[in-house]
Amino acid sequence: MEGTGAPVKTKRRYDSSRRRKQALRTRDAILAAARELFLGGGYAATTIASIAEAADVSVETIYKGFGGKPGLVRAISEKGLEGAGPIPAEQRSDEMRTLKRDPYTVMQRWGAFTTEVAPLAAPIALLLRTAAATDREVASLLDELDRARLARMEHNARELFERGDFRDGITLEYARDVLWTYSSPELYEMLVLRQGWPVERYGQFVAEGMIAALLPERREQPGHNLL
């Protein structure tokens, strides 16, 4: 019969889209439940069964999707690094670094990104640091995530280095290490979690520190404020 193909294809596309959305909702529910339980009760004490119960899914669903607790923590960490916006923070950082030629503005924005990402990612990294003392698999995951952050900081520094934005004598490796230090979960822990700094003040401190460590002194225009 003529005219019967299109409606079937449309229905299949609709069903497929609905399944994908449901799968994403399920994944988000699992990660939210796992994050809350890990941070509330600790890594070792949290079981897959308790996460499944909190997320209203089966244990098998979690093992199939994440492979166990290390996979869950990796996924939670990756989600945290995306930030809170609809576009992942790393993508926004890349786009901003390309569009903004002023390195001072770039680093101010990076400081702002830390206020968005650190509250999501740092507590999980600190949780792993504690668990790594007695769990080899967690220690390996922590090392993997830390090396990935170091590589990301080198990626961030490279374009500014190649454009000649840094002070004379600043190497790519030095710039990478400065960014790595200022993005560390330990710095967030010291200033925000322990000392009670507002996260906005912490982000400003990060931006000012990176600028002072890497960029030449800026001649300010009358009425101009760096941050």
Residue ranges, per PLM feature:
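Amphipathic, non-transmembrane alpha-helical scaffold segments
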Residues: 23, 31, 77, 107, ...
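Hydrophobic alpha-helical connector segments
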Residues: 69-71, 75, 85-119, 176
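Hydrophobic/aromatic-rich alpha-helical bundle segments in the mid-to-C-terminal region
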Residues: 139, 161-208, 217-227
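N-terminal intrinsically disordered/low-complexity leader segments
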Residues: 1-25, 218-227
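Helix-turn-helix
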Residues: 29, 33, 37-71, 75
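Amphipathic alpha-helical packing segments from all-alpha helical-bundle domains
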Residues: 112-129, 136-163, 173-177, 208-212
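Short, basic, alpha-helical segments at the C-terminal edge of helix-turn-helix-like DNA-binding modules
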Residues: 48, 77-84
